[in-house]
Amino acid sequence: MSNVNEYNDIVAFHPGYYIADIIEDMEVSQAEFATRMGTTAKTLSQLINGQANISNDLAKKLSAMLGTSVEVWQNLQNAYDQKLIEIQQAKDIDAQAELVKEIDYKYFVDVVGLPKTRSINDKVANLCKFFKVADLRIMLQPDFLVNLRSSLSLNSDKNIINSRAWIQTAINISKDIETQPYNAEKLKGYLPELRGMTVKKPKEFLPRMHEIFAECGIAFVLLPHLKNSGVNGAVKWVTDDRVVLAINNRGVYADKFWFSLFHEIRHVLQQKIKKVFISSTLEEMMDINNKLEIDADKFAKNYLISPEDYRRLAPSRYTSDDEIVEFAKTIGIHPGIVAGRLQHEGIIPQERCSKLKEKYVFEIKKMNRQILGKDEI
């Protein structure tokens, strides 16, 4: 170990660096200097080479021997320690720099009001503070956010950091949403009303939806898409009686929105408190081979369109727009949900009946941690 540490333009001089100069000026050997100082040759050698720090006892001996104050040596040690911290911080920031480049910082400026900056150092500092982590690389660790359960094929740091950033953002925003203690029976009782909202416009159903979820112990967060996150929705229990349910609002068609919502509702009802569920695309949610995900998938499909009703429709590749609209009307659901189901199951081509699939536009205002709840859309 050296008694001088350098990184970029930061230089840290260990007190041993100055002691070596003093020994040279005194024209004595290290052994003699150690004897005069009242310490061992080994201790002095470690001190000179930066392998040991100045203790209060050594500072006292040096001050008496050289006619300085004790504080001189203590200050040299403190200055060195501070420089080491600066060096480590600089190294940490440089190590996080590549990770920051994978994150759309502007998203956090627009969505949660982080300060605008072009400085990588500032971006790292601002994101660490927002995510409440000492280092962004912590968010790559397998246990970050506790027992992550994902239907997503996350195989790159870019995907992992952004998916977890999106979830943590939803959790942070949810802190401003007041909820009652979680009540599963109350939530089940509201399911018919939630299903009935499928025929309404977002500006009509969202305020009531927020109220229902809050009453059931669910902080519902509708959050803009974060590039490279691949997240469509997520469920995270923050306490035993409070859960965050977050949905991505990117290019959401009615069928995908409602399938995603009821998929996540099922995860809430599963009440696996120690797990975090992440759902990606509609296709992945419906195809994943996992018991809990299969259960959520089955629940969403069957609650929106019951098996009995689906058999009654007896869909075929010749099913027309008018038939879908009429069927949807009889079961009280948005026709786009029926069309989306038929497309996904390959009964009708993707281009067929697409005009029935209404695209929702959620205008989410600039927020400071508060996502649209009671505000108008």
Segments predicted by a language model, with ranges:
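Active-site hotspot residues in diverse enzymes, especially metal/ion-binding acidic/histidine motifs
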Residues: 2-377
